[in-house]
């Protein structure tokens, strides 16, 4: 079975390591990690992942980052991970869905989104 490819964006290496663990244990392949938006854009352009996992506190420094990503890369699915529901719209998300962070729910949500 082909693995879904993902790129991660988070401020620090510890946060990215946790995200990497969750994403890979959900059965996806992490093809890139970024700590800043320029690196993220270059990484997406070069690697063409299917999904980006974006830590929302990063987006607060860059309002509208999700809208920009979706405009530049229409094929891309963006999963915004946030400890605070109110930050989701600040980064330009079109919809919001609360999920538990189990491996099964992450994978099921991404697979469902890719099927649309």
Question: Which residues make up each language-model segment?
Answer:
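Internal alpha/beta domain cores that form substrate/cofactor-binding pockets in large enzymes
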Residues: 2-47, 51-116
């Amino acid at each position: 079975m082909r693995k879904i490819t993902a790129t991660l964006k988070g401020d620090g290496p510890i946060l990215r390591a946790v995200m990497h663990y969750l994403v890979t244990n959900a059965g996806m392949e992490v093809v890139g990690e970024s700590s800043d938006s320029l690196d993220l854009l270059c990484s997406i352009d070069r690697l063409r992942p299917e999904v980006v996992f974006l830590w929302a506190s990063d987006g607060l420094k860059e309002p509208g980052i999700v809208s920009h990503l979706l405009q530049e890369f229409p094929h891309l699915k963006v999963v915004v991970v946030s400890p605070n529901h109110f930050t989701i719209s600040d980064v330009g998300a079109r919809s919001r869905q609360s999920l538990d962070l189990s491996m099964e729910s992450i994978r099921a949500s991404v697979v469902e989104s890719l099927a649309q």
